[in-house]
Structure formats: C-alpha cells, structure tokens
Amino acid sequence: MKFHRLTAAVLAGSMLALPAAAETRVTYKSAKSASSYYQMGVQIAEAMQEASDGEISVTVEESQGSVQNVMEVRARGGDYVFTTPPVLVSLAQGGKAMFEGKGDPAFDDIRALFPIPSLTMHFVMSEESGATTLADLEGKTILLGKGSFGATEGEKYLDLFGLADKVEIADVELSNAVPAMQNGQIDGFVTAGSWPAPNVVEAAASTGVTVLSMSDEQIAETGRTKLVIPAGTYAGQDEDIVTTSLPVAAYTTTKMDDETAYQLTKTYWESKAKLGESSAWWNGVDEGLMENITGQIHPGAVRYYEEAGIALTDAQK
C-alpha cells in the first residue's frame, strides 16, 4: 500500500479557545496511486500546507476505490477522510447493491465535507484495436480494474449496451493498464478518473489511443450526466469526447470533531482557486456542486458554509 505524507496546515481556531495548538493527524483515503483522485489528494494536502502552519498532518493513502473507502468507515476513527460518489453513501446506508448484506450502523454516521471534481468515464482503446465506437468493443480484451467505482460502472455499461458477453475482461490491475496496452495484453481499458486522467494522458502519449464517445441515447441509458471533454485534452484527440460523469465528494464521519471539519472545509475552499492554476480538473468545482451532496454534511463543515453564505438544504444540515 502506498502512502503520501504531507504536513497540511489548517489555521487554528480562536486562540482564546485554543491556547496551545495541538497537531491533528488526518488520513485522506483516495484511490489508486496512478489515478487523478490520488493526485487530487496530494494537491489538497499541499494546498493546506501552504495555507497553514503545520497544525494538521495529512497522510494521503492509496485505495482500491470508492467502495473500499466506504467500507473502511466501519474500522476507522475520527481522523478518517475519504472520497466517494454520494450515491455510494446512499447505497451503503440502505444496504443495497454492492453493500447488500454488508450493512453497518457506522454507515449512518457518514457526513460530507466538500465536493471535488466529478468522476468521468473513459473508454480508452489502443489505435491498433481499430475501435472507434462502443459497438467496436465486441471481440476485444478490456481491462476494468478491481474494486473501484469505475470497474463497477464499466460492467454496468457493458451490460446496458449488450456487450457483457461479447468482450473478454482482462485480469489485470488498473495500475498496469498502460504497460498491458503497450505489450498487446489488452485492447483497451476503462477508467473513471476526472479529466485529464493521468493514466489516459500516459497512454495517449506513449501508445496512441482513441477515447470513445457515447451517443445521447447511450448516455440516457446510463442515467448519468453528460460531460464533454474538450478536444486536445489528450494527445491525438482532435474532437470533443462526449461521455458521462458522476459527482464525488470528500467525506468523514461524526467521529471527527467539529473544529477539524470546519478548518478542513474552510481551507479547501479558500485554496481552490490556486489549485485550479496547476490542474484543470479543479476549475469545474464551484458552489453549484453542493447540490450533488444529497446526504448530511458534517456540523463543522456546515458552520463554514453558513459563514460563507453558501445555501444548504434542510437535508444537508
């Protein structure tokens, strides 16, 4: 398992209330180390370091994906921050889908902090495969990865589009997607990293790929939101890529104290503009994404949103 340790500073609360600042350690559970979401975690930690004076230490921790992140709530304490689509929190709390038979009271204690860039589905095919549409996946060997939301979503799409029995699924980790494509072990891979996704950037630059677009009808079948990745985002992509997206947020649980939740949320929003200067995926994050958080927000984060004048729904408070 990989860890990226960064000291992230978060401004202390009132000096009258806290006469001596004590270090608070926070674990930020993200995704696979080659993914955009792992890089986001590192960037968030760096931003907090720059904005503060070392009172919170953030350890960015690699993960197999969003499902694992939610499941670990059962064994984690008040220092646990993790990322996942809001829909997975709802499924966990309802004991549905991949959480059926795995319900736990700890899931009811999950609380949101702030939204981060949305998941973006990428169907990435090697140029040698000749695939230019989803229908062309028939007879191809595809890597979906294991345990991640992208893998689950990819399986869903293959089933929806009548391809489940027409493709071969490679038993390869997503972190090995690019070398597997280079040596001809796979024809393509599916990843749900926010654009520009690092593994897609690498594949496009090193082997030549086609990132497949979806039709409006296919997007409607998925029930997800339409998203357009601009032409030129990836090497060799001369046209816009039309695909789907799903909101993602950073979460903790009621075990986290209000002050820590407040400072994490405050520093995140105050650092977001600078984050966007170095990575394009942050530019799509604004207050409008708050409406995608369908569950409760941590009281400490609620305090920040109320101070900042950001409207919350009754269900979020």
Could you say what each language-model-derived stretch is?
Residues 1-8:
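Bacterial N-terminal signal peptides that target proteins for export
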Residues 23-91:
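N-terminal (or domain-start) structured segment
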Residues 25-51, 56, 115-183, 287, ...:
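Bilobed "Venus flytrap"/periplasmic-binding protein-like clamshell domains
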Residues 85-86, 94-97, 102-103, 165-255:
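Pocket-lining segment of extracytoplasmic ligand-binding domains
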Residues 116-131, 226-229, 246-260:
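A bilobed periplasmic-binding-protein/Venus flytrap-type ligand-binding module shared by bacterial periplasmic
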